[in-house]
């Protein structure tokens, strides 16, 4: 597949094609051009491919997919000082305005004018070349491969979730959903010093993976009331009056309910997974236990940097999550396999410059 800037473009629901797009130009002296080498497939990419929208974000025009990427710098702007041609980088795919109140408060993930890759109307990173500001590219140390570099994005999500939960050494943490983000939440919680980390899922293979990866225990919920599952979860894992922290990385309503009920009084609940836009919520339990209930969205200041440091130091292993790598021209087949639930994290190889 030879082209100037071959890109994997979503045309409509289940309609994708390879298209040669213009090579991006350096419009900012602080910008860089990256030759994208590896891109992970995220659930949001698959959702756009399957449904053409996620909530208010609707694909109206052809859009390049992908946002979990790593690559090699091929061009730098005149004012770039931290990177040079040939540097290997993890690519943070959301560029904030830097001017609005959330940005100025240090919460740029909540930017009112966020330009996020593969979120309409912005093109994603499944292309030969992609342009970014230099400060949204994180130089990879020698011990981190480009394949691992592509997982800094979901790891950044997990870092943000665990930071929202303010996990501290010795705490007990229950993580609902043993997909890539849930598994990485287990790993980050462990790196932060949590003593008990219980992974919860309804799929046995994922639970077994979690047990061998970063969870200290696993739990398969039964088809019973949330309070009953929570009581059994607490008893089987010796959580005393309840867990200190519950993280939902599934977006499933039964998990949300069980997560609230599994917590001790004054515990912390963080919603990291996105499910239906509206669902029932056990508000009485949240109030009477005076829980700290928080949302978590993407990643913010310092999250990507910490993600790289956690992998570089050996405290988090992302290599184990990579269960498949496909060629760029096989991208659509990879989407089908991810939709079918095969593997943990599939990467698409880029086109080397």
Curated annotation (Swiss-Prot):
<dbReference type="GO" id="GO:0019569">
    <property type="term" value="P:L-arabinose catabolic process to xylulose 5-phosphate"/>
</dbReference>
<keyword id="KW-0520">NAD</keyword>
<comment type="function">
    <text>Xylitol dehydrogenase which catalyzes the conversion of xylitol to D-xylulose. Xylose is a major component of hemicelluloses such as xylan. Most fungi utilize D-xylose via three enzymatic reactions, xylose reductase (XR), xylitol dehydrogenase (XDH), and xylulokinase, to form xylulose 5-phosphate, which enters pentose phosphate pathway.</text>
</comment>
<dbReference type="InterPro" id="IPR011032">
    <property type="entry name" value="GroES-like_sf"/>
</dbReference>
<dbReference type="InterPro" id="IPR020843">
    <property type="entry name" value="PKS_ER"/>
</dbReference>
<dbReference type="GO" id="GO:0042732">
    <property type="term" value="P:D-xylose metabolic process"/>
</dbReference>
<dbReference type="GO" id="GO:0003939">
    <property type="term" value="F:L-iditol 2-dehydrogenase (NAD+) activity"/>
</dbReference>
<dbReference type="InterPro" id="IPR036291">
    <property type="entry name" value="NAD(P)-bd_dom_sf"/>
</dbReference>
<dbReference type="InterPro" id="IPR013149">
    <property type="entry name" value="ADH-like_C"/>
</dbReference>
<feature type="binding site">
    <location>
        <position position="67"/>
    </location>
    <ligand>
        <name>Zn(2+)</name>
    </ligand>
</feature>
<protein>
    <recommendedName>
        <fullName>Probable D-xylulose reductase A</fullName>
        <ecNumber>1.1.1.9</ecNumber>
    </recommendedName>
</protein>
<dbReference type="GO" id="GO:0006062">
    <property type="term" value="P:sorbitol catabolic process"/>
</dbReference>
<comment type="pathway">
    <text>Carbohydrate degradation; L-arabinose degradation via L-arabinitol; D-xylulose 5-phosphate from L-arabinose (fungal route): step 4/5.</text>
</comment>
<dbReference type="InterPro" id="IPR045306">
    <property type="entry name" value="SDH-like"/>
</dbReference>
<dbReference type="GO" id="GO:0046526">
    <property type="term" value="F:D-xylulose reductase activity"/>
</dbReference>
<feature type="binding site">
    <location>
        <position position="68"/>
    </location>
    <ligand>
        <name>Zn(2+)</name>
    </ligand>
</feature>
<feature type="binding site">
    <location>
        <begin position="177"/>
        <end position="182"/>
    </location>
    <ligand>
        <name>NAD(+)</name>
    </ligand>
</feature>
<feature type="binding site">
    <location>
        <position position="42"/>
    </location>
    <ligand>
        <name>Zn(2+)</name>
    </ligand>
</feature>
<comment type="similarity">
    <text>Belongs to the zinc-containing alcohol dehydrogenase family.</text>
</comment>
<dbReference type="GO" id="GO:0008270">
    <property type="term" value="F:zinc ion binding"/>
</dbReference>
<keyword id="KW-0479">Metal-binding</keyword>
<dbReference type="InterPro" id="IPR002328">
    <property type="entry name" value="ADH_Zn_CS"/>
</dbReference>
<keyword id="KW-0859">Xylose metabolism</keyword>
<dbReference type="Pfam" id="PF00107">
    <property type="entry name" value="ADH_zinc_N"/>
</dbReference>
<keyword id="KW-0560">Oxidoreductase</keyword>
<keyword id="KW-0862">Zinc</keyword>
<dbReference type="InterPro" id="IPR013154">
    <property type="entry name" value="ADH-like_N"/>
</dbReference>
<dbReference type="Pfam" id="PF08240">
    <property type="entry name" value="ADH_N"/>
</dbReference>
<keyword id="KW-0119">Carbohydrate metabolism</keyword>
């Amino acid at each position: 597949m030879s082209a100037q800037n071959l890109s994997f473009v979503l045309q409509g629901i289940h309609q994708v094609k390879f298209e040669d797009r213009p090579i991006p130009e350096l419009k900012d002296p602080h910008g860089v051009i990256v030759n994208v080498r590896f891109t992970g497939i995220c659930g949001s990419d698959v959702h756009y491919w399957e449904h053409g929208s996620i909530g208010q974000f609707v694909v109206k025009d052809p859009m390049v997919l992908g946002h979990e990427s790593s690559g090699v710098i091929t061009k730098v702007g005149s004012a770039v000082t931290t990177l040079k041609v040939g540097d290997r980088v993890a690519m943070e795919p959301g560029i904030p305005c830097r001017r609005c109140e959330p940005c100025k408060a240090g919460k740029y993930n909540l930017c009112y004018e966020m330009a996020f890759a593969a979120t309409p109307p912005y093109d994603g990173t499944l292309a030969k070349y992609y342009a970014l500001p230099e400060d949204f590219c994180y130089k990879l140390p020698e011990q981190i491969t480009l394949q691992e570099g592509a997982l800094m994005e979901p790891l950044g999500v997990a870092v943000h979730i665990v930071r929202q939960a303010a996990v501290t050494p010795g705490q007990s943490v229950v993580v609902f959903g043993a997909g890539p983000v849930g598994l990485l939440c287990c790993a980050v919680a462990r790196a932060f010093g949590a003593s008990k980390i219980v992974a919860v899922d309804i799929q046995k293979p994922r639970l077994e993976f979690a047990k061998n990866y970063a969870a200290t225990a696993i739990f398969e919920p039964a088809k019973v009331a949330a309070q009953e599952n929570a009581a059994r979860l607490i008893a089987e894992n010796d959580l005393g009056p309840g867990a200190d922290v519950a993280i939902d990385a599934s977006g499933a309503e039964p998990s949300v309910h069980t997560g609230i009920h599994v917590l001790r009084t004054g515990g912390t609940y963080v919603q990291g997974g996105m499910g239906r836009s509206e669902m029932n919520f056990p508000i009485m339990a949240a109030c009477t236990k005076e829980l700290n209930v928080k949302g978590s969205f993407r990643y913010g200041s310092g999250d990507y940097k910490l993600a790289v440091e956690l992998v570089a130091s050996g405290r988090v292993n992302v290599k184990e999550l990579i269960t498949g790598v496909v060629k760029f021209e096989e991208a659509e087949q990879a989407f089908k396999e991810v939709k079918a639930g095969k593997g943990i994290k599939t990467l698409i190889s880029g086109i080397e410059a």
